[in-house]
C-alpha cells in the first residue's frame, strides 16, 4: 500500500509538476506577447511623434519664413505614410522628406543665382548707359559729319541760285535798255510801259514777281546750272513784236525782191484750221493759195507799206505770249 501510495504521489507530483510547468509556460506566454506588443508600440511611437511634430521654420536670406500659405498644409504627410506599413513605410517617408528638402534647396539655390544674374545684368546696363561705347561715339561723330556736309551743300546751292538770279537781273536790264523805246517828246515810253505792266499785274500773277516792272516774257530766258542764257529766236520774235514793221523795212532796204514772211502774230496767222468754204479751200487746183481766213494781214498790204514805221504800245506784244 505504501508503495502504491508513493507511486501515486510521484505520479501526482509529476502531473502537478507537469501541470505547473504547463501552467507556467502558459503564464509566461501571455507575458512575452505583451512585451512584444509594447516593443512594437514603442518602436512605432517615435515615428508618429516625429511625423506630428511641426517642421522647423525655414528662412531665406531676407529673413522671411518660407511656409505654405494654407494652414492645413503645414502638417501634410507624404503618400507613402498612408500606403506603407512598419519600418519600411517610415524609411520611405524619411527618404521622401529628404528628397523634397533637397529639391527645395536646389530651387532656392537656382533662385539665388537668377537673382544675382539679374543684379549683374542691371549693373551692366547701368554701366552701358553711363559710359557709351566707342561704337556709339563713332556713330554720333559720323552723324555730325554728315549733317555738316549737308549744311555746306545747301549753302553752296543757295549761293549758286543767288548768282544765277543776279545774272538774270543784269541780262534783263541790258535787254530792256536795248529794246524799249526811248522817252519821246510826247511823253510816251516809260510811263506807258509802267501802265501796261500794272494792267498785266492786275490780270494775272507773274512767274517772276520781282521782275514785274519789266515787260519781258520769262520764256525768253533759259536758266541752266551753267548760267542764264537768252533764247535768240524768242528775242528775235520779241524784237519784231516791239517793232513789227522794222524787220520788213530792213528786208525791203537790203533786197527789194525778197519774199516776205508771215508775221505769226495777227489773228489769221494764229488760226490753225482751214475754213473749207472759201474759193481757195474749194479749188484744190490752186493748192499754193492759203485759206483766205488764214492769210496774214501784213502780207495783204503792198510792199511799199513796209517803209512806213508803225509803233505799237510798249508791252503789247507780250500779251500774245500769255
Curated annotation (Swiss-Prot):
Binding-site residues for Zn(2+) 1, renumbered to this chain: 263, 266, 269, 296
A GO MF term: methyl-CpG binding
Bias (Gly residues): 1-10, 87-97
Biased composition (Low complexity): 11-20, 28-52
One term under GO cellular component: cytosol
Entry keyword annotation includes Iron: no
Subcellular location: Nucleus; Cytoplasm
Free-text note regarding domains: The CXXC zinc finger mediates binding to CpG-DNA.
Protein name: CXXC-type zinc finger protein 5
Origin species: Pongo abelii (Sumatran orangutan)
Lineage: Eukaryota, Metazoa, Chordata, Craniata, Vertebrata
Encoding gene per record: CXXC5
Amino acid at each position: 500500500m505504501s508503495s502504491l501510495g508513493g507511486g501515486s504521489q510521484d505520479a501526482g507530483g509529476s502531473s502537478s509538476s507537469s501541470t505547473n510547468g504547463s501552467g507556467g509556460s502558459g503564464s509566461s506566454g501571455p507575458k512575452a506577447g505583451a512585451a512584444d506588443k509594447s516593443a512594437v508600440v514603442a518602436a512605432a511611437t517615435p515615428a508618429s511623434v516625429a511625423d506630428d511634430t511641426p517642421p522647423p521654420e525655414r528662412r531665406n536670406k531676407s529673413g522671411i519664413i518660407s511656409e505654405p500659405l494654407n494652414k492645413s498644409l503645414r502638417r501634410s504627410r507624404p503618400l507613402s505614410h498612408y500606403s506603407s506599413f512598419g519600418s519600411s513605410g517610415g524609411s520611405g517617408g524619411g527618404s521622401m522628406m529628404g528628397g523634397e528638402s533637397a529639391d527645395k534647396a536646389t530651387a532656392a539655390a537656382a533662385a539665388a543665382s537668377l537673382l544675382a544674374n539679374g543684379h549683374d545684368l542691371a549693373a551692366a546696363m547701368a554701366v552701358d548707359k553711363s559710359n557709351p561705347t566707342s561704337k556709339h561715339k563713332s556713330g554720333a561723330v559720323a552723324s555730325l559729319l554728315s549733317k555738316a556736309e549737308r549744311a555746306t551743300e545747301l549753302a553752296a546751292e543757295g549761293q549758286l541760285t543767288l548768282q544765277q538770279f543776279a545774272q538774270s537781273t543784269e541780262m534783263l536790264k541790258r535787254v530792256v535798255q536795248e529794246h524799249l523805246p526811248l522817252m519821246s517828246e510826247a511823253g510816251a515810253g516809260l510811263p506807258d510801259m509802267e501802265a501796261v505792266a500794272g494792267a498785266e499785274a492786275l490780270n494775272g500773277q507773274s512767274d517772276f514777281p520781282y521782275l514785274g516792272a519789266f515787260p519781258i516774257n520769262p520764256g525768253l530766258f533759259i536758266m541752266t546750272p551753267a548760267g542764264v542764257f537768252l533764247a535768240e529766236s524768242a528775242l528775235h520774235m520779241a524784237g519784231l513784236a516791239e517793232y513789227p514793221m522794222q524787220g520788213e523795212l530792213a528786208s525791203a532796204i537790203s533786197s527789194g525782191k525778197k519774199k516776205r514772211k508771215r508775221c505769226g502774230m495777227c489773228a489769221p496767222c494764229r488760226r490753225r484750221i482751214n475754213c473749207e468754204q472759201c474759193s481757195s479751200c474749194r479749188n484744190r487746183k490752186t493748192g499754193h493759195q492759203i485759206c483766205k481766213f488764214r492769210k496774214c494781214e501784213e502780207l495783204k498790204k503792198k510792199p511799199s507799206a513796209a517803209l512806213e514805221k508803225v509803233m505799237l504800245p510798249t508791252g503789247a506784244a507780250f500779251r500774245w505770249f500769255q
